[in-house]
Amino acid sequence: MTYKFKSNEVSMIYNCGYSIKFWIYENHKEYLVKVDTLLKESEKEYSASQLARAFGLDSVVYEKIEVVLDNDLYSAVKSESYLRSGDEEFNIYDILGDVPKTGLNSLGRFDFLINNILNKININESYLREKLLEMATFDYIICNVDRHLSNIILLKNGNEYRFSPLFDFGRSFLAYDRFTDESKIPERLRESYLTNKSAIRDIQDIDLGYSKELVNKWLEHCGGLAGIDKLDINLGHKLVIEYRINQLLNL
């Protein structure tokens, strides 16, 4: 589907990542449109959301579209708002009120996040821990290097908090869409690790056993690696996914 817009007709979202973003209303629903820049995030958003659905995870669903913006044609994705009636949206950065301490190893940083979130809001500790590990493990599989505290979202409805669906995968898959085999993946992984800004990384140092349990459950849900091969997503992205799954399960 192709949409046509003029810049002065839409409310752009600024200071929000690398892509051009704005909201539209369609069939009485609100959708976020994310237009590609040079980083070509839309293909990565789509692949990751298709994988998350195959794994049985609660994820934003990205639909591929084309956007003509000021007479220029772009690839883009759109996704329905995940907010329900009565929801209030908070990111972890705002909940904490400050950035977690630097100089912590991965386990120390993870525990710091857990303890300080628990000090700020009323949320079940097991639920909090499991959802953060689920997110971090999925980000590991897709090589998402941009899971910072501002795109980890909690939704409050009444007195209860829940996590938003997974979203924001545009900096995944080693910033590359054209792998034809696995030979170049290790080098790209090393380069990617140096630029990894994620709040939670090195999951092997946090709870490796639990992360492996998650991945095995996800594989069972989607039909194993053969099921991933059947997904309608970029071939290079599939190679990264399968490489990272094997890497994690063999740690």
Where are these regions (language model features)?
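Conserved ATP-binding subdomain of kinase catalytic cores across diverse folds
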Residues: 1-101
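C-terminal catalytic region of ATP-dependent kinase domains
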Residues: 36-40, 53, 155, 159-251
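A broad, structural surface signal
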Residues: 46, 50-54, 130-138, 246
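Glycine-rich loops and low-complexity Gly/Arg-rich segments
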Residues: 56-59, 102-106, 188-193
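ATP-dependent phospho-/nucleotidyl transfer catalytic cores
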Residues: 80-136, 225, 247
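Conserved kinase catalytic-core segment
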Residues: 110-178
